[in-house]
Amino acid sequence: MKIRENIEIFERIKLNKVAKFSDESRGRERLEEPDEIRTCFMVDRDRIIHSKSFRRLKRKTQVFIRTYGDHYRTRLVHTLEVSQVARTIGVALSLNEYLIEAIALGHDLGHAAFAHIGEDILNDFLPGGFKHNEQSVRVAKKIEKNGLGLNLTKEVLDGILNHSGFSNVSKVAGTFEGQVVRFADKIAYVNHDIDDSIRAGILKEEDLPKNIIEILGASGSERIDTLVKDCVFNTIDNIDKGEPRVSLSNEIGDAFIQLRKFLFDNIYLGKYLEDERKKAEFVLSKVIEYYYKNWGEMPELYKNICEEEGIHRGVTDYVAGMTDDYCTNEFNKIYIPKFVMY
Protein backbone atom coordinates (compact mmCIF):
# COMPACT_ATOMS: atom_id res chain seq x y z
CA MET A 1 0.00 0.00 0.00
CA LYS A 2 1.28 3.45 -0.89
CA ILE A 3 1.94 6.10 1.74
CA ARG A 4 -0.64 8.38 0.14
CA GLU A 5 -3.33 5.72 0.52
CA ASN A 6 -2.50 5.37 4.21
CA ILE A 7 -2.94 9.12 4.63
CA GLU A 8 -6.30 8.96 2.87
CA ILE A 9 -7.44 6.11 5.14
CA PHE A 10 -6.35 8.14 8.17
CA GLU A 11 -8.44 11.07 6.89
CA ARG A 12 -11.52 8.83 6.96
CA ILE A 13 -10.87 8.04 10.60
CA LYS A 14 -9.81 11.50 11.77
CA LEU A 15 -11.77 14.12 9.82
CA ASN A 16 -15.24 15.54 10.30
CA LYS A 17 -17.99 14.18 8.07
CA VAL A 18 -18.30 17.66 6.47
CA ALA A 19 -14.60 17.71 5.51
CA LYS A 20 -13.43 17.18 1.96
CA PHE A 21 -11.64 13.84 1.78
CA SER A 22 -8.66 13.79 -0.55
CA ASP A 23 -9.74 10.59 -2.30
CA GLU A 24 -13.07 12.24 -3.18
CA SER A 25 -11.54 15.17 -5.03
CA ARG A 26 -13.25 16.11 -8.29
CA GLY A 27 -9.84 15.96 -9.89
CA ARG A 28 -7.85 18.20 -12.19
CA GLU A 29 -8.46 19.69 -15.61
CA ARG A 30 -5.66 17.51 -16.99
CA LEU A 31 -5.58 13.93 -15.72
CA GLU A 32 -2.50 12.96 -13.70
CA GLU A 33 -1.29 9.83 -11.98
CA PRO A 34 -1.67 10.12 -8.17
CA ASP A 35 1.50 10.81 -6.21
CA GLU A 36 2.90 7.91 -4.17
CA ILE A 37 3.37 9.81 -0.92
CA ARG A 38 1.26 12.98 -1.19
CA THR A 39 -2.48 13.49 -1.42
CA CYS A 40 -3.78 15.62 -4.28
CA PHE A 41 -4.14 18.64 -2.00
CA MET A 42 -0.59 18.25 -0.70
CA VAL A 43 0.61 18.28 -4.30
CA ASP A 44 -1.35 21.49 -4.92
CA ARG A 45 0.15 23.14 -1.86
CA ASP A 46 3.66 22.28 -3.01
CA ARG A 47 3.06 23.52 -6.55
CA ILE A 48 1.81 26.85 -5.23
CA ILE A 49 4.73 27.33 -2.85
CA HIS A 50 7.26 26.63 -5.61
CA SER A 51 5.56 28.87 -8.18
CA LYS A 52 7.03 32.16 -9.38
CA SER A 53 3.79 33.99 -8.59
CA PHE A 54 4.02 32.93 -4.95
CA ARG A 55 7.59 34.18 -4.66
CA ARG A 56 6.64 37.54 -6.15
CA LEU A 57 4.18 38.14 -3.30
CA LYS A 58 7.15 39.17 -1.15
CA ARG A 59 7.47 42.32 -3.29
CA LYS A 60 3.78 43.19 -3.44
CA THR A 61 2.22 45.71 -1.08
CA GLN A 62 -0.34 44.73 1.53
CA VAL A 63 -1.37 48.29 2.51
CA PHE A 64 1.62 50.59 2.88
CA ILE A 65 3.42 51.32 -0.38
CA ARG A 66 7.23 51.09 -0.43
CA THR A 67 7.63 50.72 3.31
CA TYR A 68 11.22 50.34 4.38
CA GLY A 69 10.59 49.03 7.89
CA ASP A 70 11.32 45.34 8.33
CA HIS A 71 8.08 44.57 10.14
CA TYR A 72 5.38 45.80 7.78
CA ARG A 73 3.35 43.09 6.07
CA THR A 74 3.83 42.30 2.44
CA ARG A 75 1.35 40.27 0.43
CA LEU A 76 3.46 37.17 1.18
CA VAL A 77 3.41 37.69 4.94
CA HIS A 78 -0.34 38.27 4.76
CA THR A 79 -0.70 34.98 2.89
CA LEU A 80 1.25 33.09 5.55
CA GLU A 81 -0.83 34.64 8.33
CA VAL A 82 -4.03 33.66 6.52
CA SER A 83 -2.72 30.12 6.25
CA GLN A 84 -1.97 29.98 9.98
CA VAL A 85 -5.37 31.33 11.03
CA ALA A 86 -7.20 29.08 8.57
CA ARG A 87 -5.33 25.95 9.63
CA THR A 88 -6.01 26.68 13.30
CA ILE A 89 -9.74 26.92 12.59
CA GLY A 90 -9.63 23.91 10.27
CA VAL A 91 -7.85 21.62 12.72
CA ALA A 92 -10.30 22.60 15.47
CA LEU A 93 -13.16 21.62 13.14
CA SER A 94 -11.37 18.43 11.97
CA LEU A 95 -11.31 19.58 8.36
CA ASN A 96 -8.75 18.77 5.66
CA GLU A 97 -5.75 20.85 6.66
CA TYR A 98 -3.91 20.24 3.38
CA LEU A 99 -6.80 21.58 1.32
CA ILE A 100 -7.05 24.60 3.60
CA GLU A 101 -3.33 25.26 3.30
CA ALA A 102 -3.36 25.04 -0.50
CA ILE A 103 -6.30 27.45 -0.83
CA ALA A 104 -4.81 29.90 1.68
CA LEU A 105 -1.38 29.93 0.05
CA GLY A 106 -2.89 30.42 -3.41
CA HIS A 107 -5.65 32.88 -2.64
CA ASP A 108 -3.69 36.03 -3.61
CA LEU A 109 -1.50 34.71 -6.44
CA GLY A 110 -3.19 37.10 -8.86
CA HIS A 111 -3.12 40.22 -6.71
CA ALA A 112 -1.82 43.27 -8.53
CA ALA A 113 0.97 45.59 -7.43
CA PHE A 114 0.24 48.50 -5.07
CA ALA A 115 -2.46 46.63 -3.12
CA HIS A 116 -6.07 47.35 -4.03
CA ILE A 117 -5.05 50.48 -5.95
CA GLY A 118 -3.63 48.19 -8.61
CA GLU A 119 -6.82 46.16 -8.67
CA ASP A 120 -8.91 49.31 -9.16
CA ILE A 121 -6.75 50.56 -12.05
CA LEU A 122 -6.84 47.20 -13.83
CA ASN A 123 -10.57 46.94 -13.20
CA ASP A 124 -11.06 50.20 -15.12
CA PHE A 125 -8.75 49.07 -17.93
CA LEU A 126 -9.95 45.52 -18.60
CA PRO A 127 -13.31 45.15 -20.38
CA GLY A 128 -15.51 43.15 -18.06
CA GLY A 129 -13.49 44.19 -15.03
CA PHE A 130 -10.62 42.80 -12.97
CA LYS A 131 -10.93 40.96 -9.65
CA HIS A 132 -7.89 39.57 -7.89
CA ASN A 133 -9.63 36.31 -6.93
CA GLU A 134 -10.48 35.62 -10.57
CA GLN A 135 -6.95 36.58 -11.59
CA SER A 136 -5.53 34.19 -8.98
CA VAL A 137 -7.44 31.35 -10.63
CA ARG A 138 -6.23 32.52 -14.05
CA VAL A 139 -2.63 32.56 -12.83
CA ALA A 140 -3.00 29.00 -11.57
CA LYS A 141 -4.73 27.75 -14.72
CA LYS A 142 -3.13 29.80 -17.50
CA ILE A 143 -0.16 31.98 -16.55
CA GLU A 144 2.11 29.84 -14.39
CA LYS A 145 4.74 27.52 -15.88
CA ASN A 146 4.96 29.62 -19.03
CA GLY A 147 1.34 29.10 -19.98
CA LEU A 148 0.85 25.50 -18.84
CA GLY A 149 -0.61 26.41 -15.47
CA LEU A 150 -0.29 24.49 -12.21
CA ASN A 151 -3.15 22.07 -12.96
CA LEU A 152 -4.59 22.39 -9.45
CA THR A 153 -7.56 20.41 -8.19
CA LYS A 154 -11.03 21.81 -8.69
CA GLU A 155 -11.53 22.17 -4.93
CA VAL A 156 -8.47 24.41 -4.56
CA LEU A 157 -9.47 26.54 -7.55
CA ASP A 158 -13.00 26.87 -6.14
CA GLY A 159 -11.65 27.97 -2.76
CA ILE A 160 -9.35 30.55 -4.35
CA LEU A 161 -12.15 31.90 -6.55
CA ASN A 162 -14.60 32.25 -3.68
CA HIS A 163 -12.35 33.57 -0.90
CA SER A 164 -13.55 37.16 -1.44
CA GLY A 165 -16.69 38.76 -0.06
CA PHE A 166 -17.52 39.45 3.54
CA SER A 167 -21.14 38.94 4.50
CA ASN A 168 -22.54 35.52 5.35
CA VAL A 169 -24.78 35.72 2.27
CA SER A 170 -21.88 36.21 -0.18
CA LYS A 171 -21.15 33.49 -2.70
CA VAL A 172 -19.13 30.91 -0.80
CA ALA A 173 -16.79 28.05 -1.63
CA GLY A 174 -18.20 24.60 -2.21
CA THR A 175 -16.10 23.11 0.60
CA PHE A 176 -15.95 23.88 4.31
CA GLU A 177 -12.20 24.29 3.87
CA GLY A 178 -12.71 27.05 1.31
CA GLN A 179 -15.21 28.79 3.57
CA VAL A 180 -12.70 28.70 6.43
CA VAL A 181 -10.06 30.43 4.30
CA ARG A 182 -12.57 33.14 3.38
CA PHE A 183 -13.03 34.05 7.04
CA ALA A 184 -9.35 33.60 7.90
CA ASP A 185 -8.43 36.11 5.18
CA LYS A 186 -10.59 38.79 6.79
CA ILE A 187 -9.52 37.94 10.34
CA ALA A 188 -5.87 38.21 9.32
CA TYR A 189 -5.93 41.40 7.26
CA VAL A 190 -8.18 43.45 9.52
CA ASN A 191 -5.99 42.78 12.53
CA HIS A 192 -2.56 42.98 10.91
CA ASP A 193 -3.51 46.15 9.03
CA ILE A 194 -4.40 47.74 12.37
CA ASP A 195 -1.01 46.64 13.68
CA ASP A 196 0.82 48.09 10.68
CA SER A 197 -1.18 51.33 10.90
CA ILE A 198 -0.18 51.75 14.53
CA ARG A 199 3.44 51.01 13.61
CA ALA A 200 3.27 53.67 10.88
CA GLY A 201 2.01 56.21 13.40
CA ILE A 202 -1.30 56.92 11.67
CA LEU A 203 -3.41 55.10 14.22
CA LYS A 204 -3.34 54.63 17.98
CA GLU A 205 -4.91 51.84 19.99
CA GLU A 206 -7.18 54.40 21.65
CA ASP A 207 -8.51 55.46 18.23
CA LEU A 208 -10.26 52.13 17.79
CA PRO A 209 -14.00 52.27 18.57
CA LYS A 210 -14.44 51.38 22.24
CA ASN A 211 -17.71 49.52 21.75
CA ILE A 212 -16.00 47.21 19.26
CA ILE A 213 -12.89 46.71 21.39
CA GLU A 214 -15.04 45.71 24.35
CA ILE A 215 -16.46 42.89 22.26
CA LEU A 216 -13.45 41.76 20.22
CA GLY A 217 -10.51 42.61 22.47
CA ALA A 218 -8.02 45.41 23.06
CA SER A 219 -4.99 43.88 21.33
CA GLY A 220 -4.50 42.20 17.99
CA SER A 221 -3.84 38.82 19.57
CA GLU A 222 -6.98 39.12 21.71
CA ARG A 223 -9.09 40.01 18.68
CA ILE A 224 -7.73 37.14 16.61
CA ASP A 225 -8.33 34.75 19.51
CA THR A 226 -11.92 36.00 19.90
CA LEU A 227 -12.67 35.73 16.19
CA VAL A 228 -11.06 32.32 15.70
CA LYS A 229 -12.85 30.77 18.66
CA ASP A 230 -16.17 32.34 17.71
CA CYS A 231 -15.81 31.02 14.17
CA VAL A 232 -15.04 27.52 15.45
CA PHE A 233 -17.83 27.29 18.02
CA ASN A 234 -20.44 28.99 15.85
CA THR A 235 -19.62 26.68 12.95
CA ILE A 236 -19.91 23.63 15.22
CA ASP A 237 -23.37 24.88 16.22
CA ASN A 238 -24.27 25.29 12.54
CA ILE A 239 -23.20 21.72 11.78
CA ASP A 240 -25.16 20.37 14.75
CA LYS A 241 -28.26 22.22 13.50
CA GLY A 242 -27.84 20.81 10.00
CA GLU A 243 -26.69 24.14 8.52
CA PRO A 244 -23.49 23.33 6.60
CA ARG A 245 -21.72 26.69 6.67
CA VAL A 246 -18.82 28.47 8.33
CA SER A 247 -19.79 31.71 10.05
CA LEU A 248 -19.35 34.06 12.98
CA SER A 249 -22.05 34.65 15.57
CA ASN A 250 -24.26 37.68 15.03
CA GLU A 251 -22.68 39.74 17.84
CA ILE A 252 -19.07 39.03 16.88
CA GLY A 253 -19.81 39.24 13.16
CA ASP A 254 -21.48 42.65 13.49
CA ALA A 255 -18.61 44.01 15.60
CA PHE A 256 -16.11 42.69 13.08
CA ILE A 257 -17.93 44.34 10.17
CA GLN A 258 -17.86 47.65 12.06
CA LEU A 259 -14.13 47.29 12.72
CA ARG A 260 -13.49 46.57 9.04
CA LYS A 261 -15.55 49.65 8.07
CA PHE A 262 -13.47 51.72 10.49
CA LEU A 263 -10.32 50.59 8.66
CA PHE A 264 -11.75 51.43 5.25
CA ASP A 265 -12.84 54.89 6.37
CA ASN A 266 -9.66 55.77 8.25
CA ILE A 267 -6.85 53.81 6.61
CA TYR A 268 -7.56 52.26 3.21
CA LEU A 269 -9.49 55.27 1.92
CA GLY A 270 -8.20 57.79 4.46
CA LYS A 271 -6.24 60.97 3.80
CA TYR A 272 -2.91 59.64 5.10
CA LEU A 273 -2.38 57.37 2.09
CA GLU A 274 -4.03 59.68 -0.44
CA ASP A 275 -0.80 61.11 -1.91
CA GLU A 276 0.83 57.68 -2.18
CA ARG A 277 -2.30 56.28 -3.81
CA LYS A 278 -2.20 59.01 -6.46
CA LYS A 279 1.47 58.29 -7.20
CA ALA A 280 0.80 54.57 -7.51
CA GLU A 281 -2.21 55.19 -9.74
CA PHE A 282 -0.12 57.40 -12.01
CA VAL A 283 2.77 54.94 -12.28
CA LEU A 284 0.55 51.94 -12.97
CA SER A 285 -1.66 53.81 -15.44
CA LYS A 286 1.35 54.98 -17.45
CA VAL A 287 2.87 51.49 -17.54
CA ILE A 288 -0.45 50.06 -18.76
CA GLU A 289 -0.75 52.83 -21.35
CA TYR A 290 2.73 52.11 -22.68
CA TYR A 291 2.32 48.36 -23.05
CA TYR A 292 -1.12 48.74 -24.58
CA LYS A 293 0.53 50.72 -27.37
CA ASN A 294 3.69 48.58 -27.45
CA TRP A 295 2.44 45.11 -26.54
CA GLY A 296 5.00 43.55 -28.87
CA GLU A 297 7.67 44.41 -26.28
CA MET A 298 6.14 42.15 -23.65
CA PRO A 299 7.46 38.62 -22.97
CA GLU A 300 6.39 35.91 -25.42
CA LEU A 301 3.69 34.45 -23.16
CA TYR A 302 1.84 37.75 -22.94
CA LYS A 303 2.25 38.53 -26.63
CA ASN A 304 0.59 35.19 -27.35
CA ILE A 305 -2.27 36.08 -25.02
CA CYS A 306 -2.69 39.40 -26.84
CA GLU A 307 -3.02 37.55 -30.13
CA GLU A 308 -5.39 34.91 -28.74
CA GLU A 309 -7.52 36.90 -26.29
CA GLY A 310 -6.93 40.55 -27.11
CA ILE A 311 -4.47 43.24 -26.11
CA HIS A 312 -6.41 44.30 -23.00
CA ARG A 313 -6.22 40.77 -21.63
CA GLY A 314 -2.54 40.28 -22.40
CA VAL A 315 -1.50 43.62 -20.92
CA THR A 316 -3.63 42.99 -17.83
CA ASP A 317 -2.01 39.61 -17.23
CA TYR A 318 1.47 41.08 -17.63
CA VAL A 319 0.93 44.12 -15.42
CA ALA A 320 -1.03 42.18 -12.78
CA GLY A 321 1.97 39.93 -12.29
CA MET A 322 4.36 42.81 -11.64
CA THR A 323 5.64 43.53 -8.15
CA ASP A 324 5.65 47.09 -6.81
CA ASP A 325 9.38 47.42 -7.47
CA TYR A 326 9.24 45.91 -10.95
CA CYS A 327 6.37 48.18 -11.97
CA THR A 328 8.20 51.24 -10.66
CA ASN A 329 11.38 50.18 -12.46
CA GLU A 330 9.43 49.71 -15.69
CA PHE A 331 8.01 53.21 -15.30
CA ASN A 332 11.51 54.62 -14.77
CA LYS A 333 12.90 52.69 -17.73
CA ILE A 334 10.13 53.90 -20.03
CA TYR A 335 9.66 57.51 -18.94
CA ILE A 336 12.65 58.77 -16.96
CA PRO A 337 15.60 60.10 -19.03
CA LYS A 338 18.90 58.36 -18.48
CA PHE A 339 21.97 60.38 -17.62
CA VAL A 340 24.36 60.81 -20.51
CA MET A 341 28.04 61.55 -19.95
CA TYR A 342 29.70 63.77 -22.60
Swiss-Prot record:
CDD domains: HDc (cd00077). Belongs to the dGTPase family. Type 2 subfamily. InterPro entries: Diverse_Catalytic_Enzymes, dNTPase_2, HD/PDEase_dom, HD_domain, PHydrolase_assoc_dom. HAMAP family: dGTPase_type2. Gene3D superfamilies: Hypothetical protein af1432. The keyword Heme does not apply. Residues 75-190 form the HD domain. The lineage of its organism: Bacteria, Bacillati, Bacillota, Clostridia, Eubacteriales. SUPFAM superfamilies: HD-domain/PDEase-like. Keywords: Hydrolase. It comes from Clostridium perfringens (strain ATCC 13124 / DSM 756 / JCM 1290 / NCIMB 6125 / NCTC 8237 / Type A). Pfam families: HD, HD_assoc. One of its GO terms (molecular function) is triphosphoric monoester hydrolase activity. This is Deoxyguanosinetriphosphate triphosphohydrolase-like protein.
